[in-house]
Amino acid sequence: FDEFVCEITPKTKKTVVYLNEEYAGSGDVGVSLLAKFLGALLQVENKPEYVICVNNAVKMTTNRAHPSFKPLKDLEAAGVKILSCGSCLEAYKLVSDLSVGEMSNAYEVMQILTTHEQIKL
């Protein structure tokens, strides 16, 4: 009787954090809460491949004083790609202020969202 050993490696899912606002939840602590969540992402083993910022979440990638700016910068340094919606940056007149990550477009965002597991905060 022969024994066969098969090693099964768990499939790691590609993930994207999709941010629609510059805060998590609602209320007075939402801005600082999101900064804490983003900071906690640095500690997890399976970091997301992308963080996508749309609507007023782009303010986090353009304002160095925003509580979430540093965690986003740290995530970028750890290899996470940070993308900001170009139309949103244009609407808020923030294109020239983009200081972390890259400007993206609707096509690229949809390509990523349809091929990655999404985390929304």
What residues fall within each predicted segment?
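Glycine-rich anion/phosphate-binding loops
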Residues: 31-32, 101-103
